[in-house]
């Protein structure tokens, strides 16, 4: 049924609950989960210089730090996952990655913080639900 699950996360408490739901589904259905972390603003020039302009590695490092709890859930349980990090509008990036990865289900928290500051059901979650081409599970 759901073999490819996309989990949009930002490390917030609601995102952690969404991660637990996604992990439970992945375990029960033997699904692969794509963890998606969206950064709204690119790293500063000084950070990019320090990272030798390896922006992808810098973004991945930031993401792993912010969503360590989520990654730990998947690694501890031995669940298959991939981490995708993008810069831009959270809703648009989540939808784009879901389409590219051919996700069967998107799991997202109802509100968050961090790079998704001020995410309320009326914004990112609603946009994702409205525009996604697959079912969306919003976790409170």
Segments the model singles out, each with a brief description of its role:
Residues 10, 88, 110-113:
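Histidine-centered beta-alpha loop that forms part of the nucleotide-sugar donor binding/catalytic region
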Residues 31-32, 79, 103, 134:
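Short glycine/serine/threonine/alanine-rich loop segments
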Residues 72-106:
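Structural beta-alpha unit
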Residues 34, 82, 137:
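Conserved beta-strand positions in the Rossmann-like core of class I SAM-dependent methyltransferases
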Residues 52-65:
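A short acidic, glycine-rich active-site loop
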Residues 96-140:
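Gly/Ser-rich helix-loop-strand patches that form or flank binding pockets
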Residues 3-51, 73, 77:
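Small/aliphatic-rich secondary-structure junction motif
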């Amino acid at each position: 049924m759901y073999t490819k699950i996309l989990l949009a996360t930002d490390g917030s408490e609601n995102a952690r609950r969404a991660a637990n739901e996604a992990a439970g589904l992945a375990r029960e259905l033997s699904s692969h989960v794509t963890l998606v972390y969206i950064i709204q603003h690119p790293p500063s020039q000084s950070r990019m210089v320090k990272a030798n302009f390896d922006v992808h590695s810098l973004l991945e490092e930031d993401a792993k730090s912010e969503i360590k709890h989520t990654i730990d859930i998947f690694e501890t349980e031995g669940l298959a996952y991939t981490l995708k990090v993008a810069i831009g509008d959270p809703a648009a990036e989540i939808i784009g990655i879901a389409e590219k990865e051919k996700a069967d289900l998107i799991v997202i928290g109802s509100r968050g913080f961090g790079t998704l500051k001020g995410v309320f059901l009326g914004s990112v979650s609603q946009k994702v639900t409205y525009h996604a081409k697959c079912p969306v599970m919003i976790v409170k």
